[in-house]
């Protein structure tokens, strides 16, 4: 996690599947959006830049609400040049590929992703060639419904409130996918509900039925 001024950036990786994604939030309301995103991702471990570690509300949320292990990081891996080097080394970025525009949310996410790649390269004693592709998320504001941790738990989107199990949750009811990739996709859809009617309709039209 990276923090600078009013801006935040997050990157996440699932080592078992190779999924690697990053997103960023800028300006007013950025911290609230960050907490909502953390509620969706439910990280078990977080690497914090010095700026992020200084945000007591964020670190308390990670430790107390999400039971997440917080590890202090250095500013160096979050620099654009070092982030690019780490991503190229892990096969997540092509050497000839241009950087995201300066000042953009994508560049913030790029820096967070690079710092995570740098951390994994140093700590994981295994081949990382299965990681990727890197997804730099930059959706228009208001595209998704904002749900905080309490709302997510009360709605039992992906696990039940009582037993923290999939069975009985909305995901359990809707998931008729036949592949691991399909399961991950429908889970991601449920965790980030769309708001635009047109996009909702297109998504419904794209779903096949048995």
Features from the language model and the residues they span:
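Charged catalytic and DNA/RNA-contacting regions of genome-maintenance
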Residues: 1-210
């Amino acid at each position: 996690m990276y923090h600078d001024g009013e801006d935040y950036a997050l990157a996440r990786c699932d080592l078992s599947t190779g999924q690697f994604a990053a997103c960023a939030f800028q300006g007013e309301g950025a911290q609230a959006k960050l907490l909502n995103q953390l509620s969706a991702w439910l990280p078990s471990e977080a690497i914090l830049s010095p700026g992020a570690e200084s945000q007591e509300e964020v670190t308390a949320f990670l430790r107390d609400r999400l039971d997440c292990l917080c590890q202090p990081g250095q500013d160096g891996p979050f620099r654009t040049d070092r982030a690019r080097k780490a991503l190229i080394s892990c096969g997540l970025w092509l050497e000839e590929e241009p950087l995201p525009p300066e000042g953009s949310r994508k560049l913030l996410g790029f820096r967070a992703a690079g710092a995570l790649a740098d951390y994994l390269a140093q700590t994981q004693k295994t081949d990382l060639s299965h990681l990727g592709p890197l997804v730099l998320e930059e959706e228009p504001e208001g595209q998704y419904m904002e749900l905080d941790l309490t709302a997510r738990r009360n709605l039992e989107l992906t696990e039940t409130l009582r037993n923290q199990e999939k069975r009985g949750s909305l995901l359990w009811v809707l998931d008729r996918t036949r592949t691991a990739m399909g399961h991950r996709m429908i889970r991601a859809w449920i965790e980030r509900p769309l708001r635009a009617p047109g996009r909702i309709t297109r998504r419904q039209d794209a779903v096949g039925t048995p």
